């Protein structure tokens, strides 16, 4: 899981992979920054295995019927949502509300960190000793994020596949791997839908910042292993483009395209069975992924944002006050963990 390598590394249980002589060459297999969640102090404790990110899914047929253009900014997204809602249809913005959020990492739980990064903010301070959740940009981003559900009434829980297939939800942000599910299990809408970059914030020069946070898994080597060199050779083999392509193709041949690997290897993704246009769209959005570091006590940040959200959504608490109060709890836990492991 996303958070486990750092949790184990700070307990001195993992091997620092950056100490291997050819690490610098191996890490080039992945998108720039993919290793960030697996860094601790001056070491790197996992190789990216899978990496997931969001894309905008839209129904071409319904967009044409309603006269909607594919939105590039959040303002355009909300304008399109208004047209869709007036037609008694829904818009989907993902929120992970089950137990998997505890190990998924803050970047994969909701779009709040994405909105925060697009607005120029960060989750943690530069030295990673505290959060920046009480900063003005964090509060503005959280207010916007929560307003999607409180003011615009986007559903918090929904079945993306069923609603998108039926046309009940013609626009939604979803993990890019939903692409294969729709291709295989919804042949009746083949050619009637597409993918695009997620909405972003317009910069002063007119360009759009549509960066986003990501999720995924990593592969590790235990520090007490008596076969570190052999384990490293295995990780290099496992994360290579050849192995990832073969593994994914074998899964697809046995279980169908829905099992296509969400590989972190960039060359492997290009060699999998995506259409040329969609491959280019995926790669361009993948380049915009900015991973959030995992820090000691960072699991409280995931919980804090979740609790702050529900206090706004369920209890009507003011978004800024809710996030600020929870950020103090996170900072206290980070400080406690840093003291416990001799970092302060």
What are these regions (language model features)?
Residues 1-54, 78, 107-111, 190-199, ...:
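Hinge/lid segment of periplasmic solute-binding proteins
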Residues 40-49, 54, 78-130, 169:
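Extracytoplasmic/periplasmic solute-binding protein
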Residues 48, 213, 274-329:
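C-terminal capping/gating helix-and-loop segments adjacent to ligand/active sites or protein-protein/ligand interfaces
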Residues 57-60, 214-227, 312:
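A bilobed periplasmic-binding-protein/Venus flytrap-type ligand-binding module shared by bacterial periplasmic
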Residues 80-85, 126-156, 198:
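Glycine-centered hinge/linker elements that transmit conformational signals in sensory
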Residues 137-144, 217, 226-238, 246, ...:
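Short amphipathic alpha-helical coupling segments at ligand-binding clamshell hinges
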Residues 143, 192-220, 235-260, 336:
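Periplasmic-binding protein-like
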